[in-house]
Amino acid sequence: MEKKQNLTASNPETVTIFRAEYEKFLGQEQQLLSQNERIFRLENQVSVLTEALRLARHKQFGASSEKSEEPLMEQLSFLFNEAEVFAEVSTKQEEAVVVAAHKRHKKHEYTLDNIPEGIPTKQVEHRLEGEELVCPQCGDTMTEIGKEVVRTLEIIPAQTIVREDIYYTYACKSCSENADEGCETPMVKAPKEKNIIPGSFATPEAVAHIMTQKFVMGSPLYRQEQDLNRRGIPLSRQTMSNWILRATENYLTPVYEQMHKELLRREVLHADETTLQVLHEPGKAPQSESYMWLYRTSGDTNKPIVLYEYQPGRGAKHPEAFLKGFKGYLHTDGYAGYHNLPEEITVVGCWAHARRKFDEAVRSLPKGKAKGSSASQGLTYCNLLFRMEQEIADKTAEERYEERLKQAKPVLDAIFAWANSRTAAPKSALGKALNYLKEQWPYLTNYLKDGRLELSNNRAERSIKPFVIDRKNFLFANTPKGAAGSAVMFSLIQTTMENGLDPYRYLTWLMHTANHADLTDTQVVQSLLPWNAPAELYTK
């Protein structure tokens, strides 16, 4: 050892060579570590992009249904060690019946089209006459012995007629004959009907038709203009737009405001929002996004209300202002803006959104890799919760509350423990699903607090869908005033249909009645609400 130390000490060049090689080795090791880190990042990026590509392809070419292909109890096989948690769950299979060594799938039930009773009927009789009645055998005249009735359906396009109101003037003939003696001739004229839009030739029927074509059938005003022009009626889209806005402002807005007051008195609501492009929004570019907000009642009422509200942004201040005075539960999606509402509003999360994210994670996996994966397990947990809700749907609110504590609470505890035991790349589909579940957990479990609450916010999504579909036709609103008017129109029409009314007949009745009413009187406006409409306005 002493000899080796002496050798090193006597040869400083050797020390220098050893040190240089050592530093070179360290540099290569550091470079290798950096390359490995870069490879790891790139592999993760490729994995995320591949998932996104599979998901995009599925959305474009695959089935849109989120229904699971495996029966629920087969999906639950990975939970065999927690069987006591699910002991209350029904094991019946509704979609397939196992017979011998094969499966017999449930037949699809078709709804046969038919002509309902009560439709106006036109009878056309087909009889034989003259020589047609001569018997080909003996030449005698044949007599009627029976008939066959064949029912078919005729559809007559909307008819357009001109209504002429003729107001007669009356005078006293006797006074007229004695006019020379200083007798004035009194004249009386039949009182005029008040036009719903002064100075126009609009009628409640015409305006209601334009409204329902645009907001129920999704036919933009330019298409209605073309249709009217083909029938020889030169009615411009500008005129129709003005009619809608004037009628909305004068007759529909008071009813909308009263429904807003009624909405705030309810204890369970739903909310959602979607984008809308408004071309002439002050201080904003035409390409920027504004928002249509939706607020509606839940399934605990027989007087449903659906209200839309236009706002230029998506800030939390908008739902806070609209819901001022409301105290109760609000079903929402995971948007953070709802989480900053006043404390008297309890936000209830949406399990349909959580399930959708796990469903996307499953669909993003390579073919054959889904079964048994963490994404599939998360989806199975969500399916179990929805199955439980189906089984208690017909129970009272109090019974649902008790059943959820008994059945769903243990499942929720198991889901949370399972989610905390899983890891995934944050940007992967599974990572996003797990992150959503953990972040939204306090809101996702709030539905346990009251039996009237629902597992998802699908009720709001279904109500905002008509606007989303119509938006594909009209694309944008021209002005904020027009967007606000559209919100009132959608509100009246969707609330009308939810209450079982025919929107055209209701709007016609509403404008006829409101045209002669004092809309500053709350009781008068109350009488115009959809659930107070006459029975003949309801759909058959």
PLM region spans:
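Short, flexible loop/hinge motifs at secondary-structure junctions
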Residues: 1-201, 241, 270-271, 404
